[in-house]
């Protein structure tokens, strides 16, 4: 809303040219009124038509005066604007770069410096901030390209009376003409202890933190030498240039959110951090080239509407010439990373001391506190709570690396569940399986010297009995039977020695009554002769498979 001006106000010479049209109009109207009064004196009895014309002229004069002096009375006619020019405009731009929201005392100083009323200074700053928010909202993005920001700095002297503006983010505390973006563009390998990520917003439910400004290049050396996350170190890096920073600690494997705010003229640093091990799911969404084209088209349409609303042809041409510079490159693609966590994060706060006499390093530590988000949404955003993820928006390249870093950590540090190491026999090539009956030099204690003899492996008597029965029905030569008997005797010697050294002669007599299959039959079916684990700590003195057929009864069988 523009200020109501009176004609007898003594303006500064910088704005005299802006009011020439008002003074000229005033002189013409006064001359016309004087002529009408003179004609009225010459004609004492005017005709009714002339009186009607005089009243109409007087009403028209009153309407013109009201339309030109009261800008708050909105009507079909667009009100004229008062613009700052020359040195006054340069001063306003410099002050806006330093502080876009000056206080009443600061606006008064600016007013005295340029000879402009304080209300006009306040309106100029309001219109400049409103124009920035309008272009941010029109682009449907969280950032403003640097070239577009330079255009904003050039045309903010044009006033705006649009009351339908929607604010989507706070205004940056410091604006940089060379690079007005929200991206810090810190190399990922710039620090040996921390990874810095280009994040422009953090959202958890309806709680949202938008980034303003960017880290200054003169602080890159401090970033490179950062060794701890003390409040003073973090504040020195942010240095009133940005109010949001996200990093991951390599040593502690923690994700850290840092942001700042002002309350009662005191700067407050906030910190939210949680371990990577609490992240149970990552969901990365990347912006496509079609999204960039649509964003550029929206930006061009917004610039076109702004140019149509402006009554300055020179500035309109300037915006049209620079519209092609508003296109974002593919390297500036945006991304969105959603993190689902299994526990609540930790919250900390630090109040910066403004006392000049006190050393700030005396209390250089974070104070653990409760959740300071709206409705404690961040504290409850975990699996089993509200199940709401942490949504991070930022530079696509940076989010890609962050997603890969979390996944690599999870894959290398997660404790896998206990897996049964037993290998199915079908999966093992049969040529690599040595038949246990033929290895006369092997022992159950060879693979593990500490194995107790009582816990040594033994044969499955059911399988062996079946094999013996099948062998009795088959035909074999006497030489084959004798060779099989000799091999089995060697195996029995080892088995008997591992079972409390029983009498080998008795075992040979029992075995002589059995007819075993030859070696070829055993190798052909190795799966029928697998060993089984013991089920009892006390083994019988004489295994069943060593007994003759008559002794294999229920009275003699052991369980």
Swiss-Prot record:
Cystine pairs: none
A GO cellular component annotation in the UniProt record: nucleus
Biological source species: Saccharomyces cerevisiae (strain ATCC 204508 / S288c)
Protein name in the entry: Regulatory protein PHO2
Keyword ATP-binding: no
Compositional bias annotation for Acidic residues: 308-323
PROSITE patterns: HOMEOBOX_1, HOMEOBOX_2
GO biological process: cell differentiation; chromatin remodeling; positive regulation of phosphate metabolic process; positive regulation of transcription by RNA polymerase II; regulation of histidine biosynthetic process; regulation of purine nucleobase metabolic process; regulation of transcription by RNA polymerase II
